[in-house]
């Protein structure tokens, strides 16, 4: 069984037992969270697609860890104008373990 969930402004296709990295969620490590923004649920060839959400469908996840992605370097330059600007960014993430999918 799999589901398509929405969290942090992005959509993820998940199945029970998988680990995913999502945008940072304000929760403690080891805490269980119920995600109710389920866009689709499927098993085999049968699929339920929500409009926009599947009513009554939930995905239970456990917070494994919090961390930061690798640094992304931004470099801006204007040719012939002696203008250069360097900037770096590291995005925070939360690693989740997918538990039960109900729907």
UniProtKB/Swiss-Prot annotation:
GO MF term list: rRNA binding; structural constituent of ribosome
Gene Ontology cellular-component annotations: cytoplasm; ribonucleoprotein complex; ribosome
Pfam family, one: Ribosomal_L21p
Alphabetical GO biological process terms: translation
Keywords for this protein: Ribonucleoprotein, Ribosomal protein, RNA-binding, rRNA-binding
InterPro entries assigned: bL21-like (IPR028909), bL21-like_sf (IPR036164), Ribosomal_bL21 (IPR001787), Ribosomal_bL21_CS (IPR018258)
Subunit structure: Part of the 50S ribosomal subunit. Contacts protein L20.
Role description: This protein binds to 23S rRNA in the presence of protein L20.
Family of the protein in this entry: Belongs to the bacterial ribosomal protein bL21 family.
Protein name per its UniProtKB record: Large ribosomal subunit protein bL21
């Amino acid at each position: 069984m799999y589901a398509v969930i929405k969290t942090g402004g992005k959509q993820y296709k998940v199945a029970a037992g998988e680990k995913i990295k999502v945008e940072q969620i304000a929760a403690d490590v080891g805490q269980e969270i119920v995600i109710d923004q389920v866009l689709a649920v499927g098993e085999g060839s049968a699929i339920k697609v929500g409009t926009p959400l599947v009513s009554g469908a939930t995905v239970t996840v456990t917070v494994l860890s919090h961390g930061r992605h690798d640094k992304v370097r931004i470099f801006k330059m204007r040719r012939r104008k002696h203008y250069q600007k360097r900037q770096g960014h590291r995005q925070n993430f939360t690693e989740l373990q997918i538990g039960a999918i109900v729907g």
